[in-house]
Amino acid sequence: RGVLVEELFSEEGVGTMVHTDSYREIRPLKEEDIPELLSMIARSVVDSKLVDRNYEDIAAKIDDYYVLTLDDSIVGCVAVYPYPEHRSAELGCLYIKHRHEGRGYGRTLCEFARKKAEEMGVDFIFALSQSAVHYFRDRMHYAEFSRDSLPPERLRALELSGRKSGVFGLRLKDNN
């Protein structure tokens, strides 16, 4: 594609931009964002890369969801589900729109989730995946853990789902 087309018709463009507003930010999900989030992740749900969620599921846990925006357009999402009684948190619903992949936004959201988990005071953050094994292990340096390391209620839900997800996690040393 030409530079002018890229500049005019993408959120990122190719030139220098000066403005007073935050161009790229991670913010809490708003209720009015839920339909867009569901539409955005739909293909990955069909491909079994993400767990199926509906409006009510997300609305019930809306405080756990965050979106990455570029110029006020949602380009990615992540959820941080706390399990305080197990001193752990789950990184879930990690997704970047296809045209924004390869720009480090997945890493940005994973690091954001880790910081949120640290703020919660938990000792362990984990992600469940059957398709992003190499991403979590090789790029994010998450170690592989047994399913026994999961909070009991999360383990039950995983077993009931029938998904063959691996468990990848990080011990958060600063909270010990």
Listing of model-derived features with the role each one plays in the protein:
Residues 50-88, 92-96:
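A conserved beta-strand-loop-helix scaffold within acyl/acetyltransferase catalytic domains
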Residues 110, 131, 135, 149-155:
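Short glycine/proline-centered loop/turn elements that form peptide/ligand docking sites
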Residues 69-71, 170-173:
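Active-site beta-strand termini and strand-to-loop segments that position acidic
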Residues 1-57, 102:
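C-terminal catalytic "cap/lid" subdomain
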Residues 94-101, 131:
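A short, internal acetyl-CoA/4′-phosphopantetheine-binding micro-motif in the GNAT/acyltransferase core
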Residues 126, 141-166:
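Conserved catalytic-core motifs of GNAT/GCN5-like acyltransferases
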Residues 102-115, 127:
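Conserved acetyl-CoA-binding loop-helix of GNAT-fold acetyltransferases
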Residues 116-130:
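Conserved GNAT acetyl-CoA-binding A-motif
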